[in-house]
Amino acid sequence: NFRSALPDGETHHQYRAASDGQLGGIMKLYREWQISGDHQWLARMYPLAKKSLNYCIRSWDPRGKGVLEEPHHNTYDIEFWGPDGMCSSIYIGALSAMAHMARDLNRPEDAEDYRSLAEGGAEFLDKHLYNGEYYDQKVTYRGLRDTSFAKFVKRVNRKSGEVDKLL
């Protein structure tokens, strides 16, 4: 498949990281630390997890809302444009996990930054995506750093009423 090479080796693609997989890795790190209680292991792994999470923040939440807004790939092998309940809830979980790990490692600034983002994200989901029954996706392509979809939409024939329903 395009994500791994068999036999083991370099993959030759330019695909984006899967947001749910990337963020799920941080939650798995937290789980393994909770099960093992190995603080030395956590201290070794934390800088790598921080690098991974900061990549996610820069790439998908550059405005610091606590939700993934920029186009983000996922393990369904599609791109989500705009905030969605699925990947954003995993993001909030990863932020919360990092806040707990940072606090345990006596990194209060990191803990507060991640906690604040997670709290803001949870509030955003409830306010903007919850429809009283479930969390919806808010498809967004305007006002993002990635303008490729907005440029594509400008070329779409708008004479069809169905197109307006989709956009």
Predicted regions, residues:
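Aromatic-rich carbohydrate-recognition surfaces in CAZymes
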Residues: 1-64, 82-102, 115-118, 122
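Catalytic cores of carbohydrate-active enzymes
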Residues: 61-86, 90-167
